[in-house]
Every structure is written in C-alpha cells, then in structure tokens.
Regions:
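Extracytoplasmic ligand-binding site segments that recognize negatively charged/polar headgroups
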Residues: 83, 96-113, 144-166
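A ligand-binding cleft/hinge motif common to bilobed small-molecule-binding domains
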Residues: 79-90, 201-212
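Alpha-helical, coiled-coil/dimerization segments enriched in small aliphatic residues
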Residues: 39-44, 159-186
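A short, structured surface patch at a secondary-structure boundary
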Residues: 14-79
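Short beta->alpha connector loops at strand-helix junctions that form conserved
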Residues: 76-77, 97-100, 182
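Bacterial Sec-exported substrate-binding components of ABC uptake systems
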Residues: 1-23, 120-150, 198-201
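Alpha-to-beta junction loops
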Residues: 68-73, 94, 176, 197-202
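Short acidic active-site motifs
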Residues: 60-64, 83-84, 136, 189-193
C-alpha cells in the first residue's frame, strides 16, 4: 500500500471503506455489492449511503468495523485514530492504507492501487483513462470562475475549504479557482469574510445545506 506495507488478500467479499473517494472507486470498479461498511463521508453513489456506517473516518472504532466481519479494510492515511488502525491490523484483517493527497496524479495512483488490490486492474486503467479524457474536455475559460465550497455541519458551524483539500482539487479539475487561498484545510468563516472572497459560485453538499 502507500505506506510500503505488503497487503495479502484473496478475493475479498466483505469490504469496509474508510474514505468517500475510496468508496466511490470501489463502486466504479463494479464491486459495490461487496462493500459491507462505509464511513460517514461516503455519500456517493447513493447506494453507498445504504451501507452500514462505521462513523467519521478520522474517529472510527475497531469494534464497529470488526463487527461487520470484513475480509478487507481500505482506508487512507487520514483515517484513524492510529491505535484503531493498529487494532484492526492486529486482528488479522488485512487493511490497506492509501495516500489521501488531492492532486490529480495522487487520485490516479489511488485508483490504480485499489484496482490492483481487488484484481480489477483493467477496469482501473479504464477509470484513469476516462478521468484524463474528461479533464481534456473541460472548457477553458479566459477568466475561470471563483468558487467557494462551504462544509456545513449544523449548529452554526460553517467551515470553508481552503487549499490542499479535496474540494479545492475538484474546483480546479472543473476549470474553476478556489475563492479562498490564504489558508489550507477547512476553517470557519464569518459572513463578512465570505462576501469579501467575492465568489462567482458557492457550493454545498446536499446534507450540509439541509443542516443549516
């Protein structure tokens, strides 16, 4: 995996995924039926939301994951806490840790590693090729639109995506520019700062909008 550890598996039938992009990739490879558990960030495709949830990927519990009887756990290096990852590994259940980096190259490498783990290398190559083809089709604007992504979780908490986030990467891939570039990660932002960023578009997730 991305940590240099060797992960040995044999035709896994019960997979737990601990990242939205990992979940989406497994579904795209045609193996969604083999997923028995997902983390709270796994909102796409819609079928993923019907799987057993094991909590937010940064705060999962070994007991919740192992109770599903998985024969493979696929996570990113952002999953945790670390002692839980070690508990899963010590239980004998294979766990593959992939990079959570957000560049295009990192996303392609992640897809290829997941495809190799699941013996779907041909399908993985097709996914990567399709990604590259779609990127070439993105319309290039002389003045790319400024896009603001708000991750709302209710209770008045509105975190805005800065650089080095999956939202920032997706905005770039779609031909836009992030309206917020003066910090990395997600941070709260008040109404005045939101207006000052002068976005052309503001994005929410469906669930985030409902929580406001």
């Amino acid at each position: 995996d991305s940590t240099g550890k060797t992960v040995t598996i044999d035709n896994p039938q019960k997979i737990v995924t601990l990242s939205g992009n990992v979940t989406e990739t497994v579904f795209a490879l045609g193996l969604g039926d083999q997923i028995v558990g997902v983390d709270a960030s796994s909102l796409y495709p819609e079928e993923a939301t019907k799987k057993s949830q094991v909590g937010y990927y940064r705060r999962v519990s070994a007991e919740g994951i192992l109770s599903l009887g998985p024969d493979l756990v696929i996570a990113t290096d952002a999953a945790g806490p670390p002692n839980v990852i070690e508990q899963i590994r010590s239980s004998g259940v294979p766990i593959a840790i992939l990079s959570s980096a957000h560049t295009i190259k990192d996303a392609q490498t992640r897809i290829e590693l997941i495809a190799k783990l699941l013996d779907k290398e041909k399908e993985g190559h097709i996914l990567v090729w399709n990604m590259e083809d779609e990127m070439k089709q993105v319309i290039k604007h002389e003045a790319p639109p400024k896009v603001l992504f708000i991750y709302a979780r209710g209770g008045g908490t509105q975190n805005v995506a800065g650089t080095d986030t999956s939202a920032d990467a997706m905005i770039s891939l779609a031909g836009g520019v992030n309206a917020v570039t003066d910090y990395s990660g997600y941070k709260p932002m008040n109404a005045e700062a939101l207006i000052a960023s002068a976005p052309d578009y503001i994005l929410f997730t469906d669930r985030g909008l409902e929580s406001m």
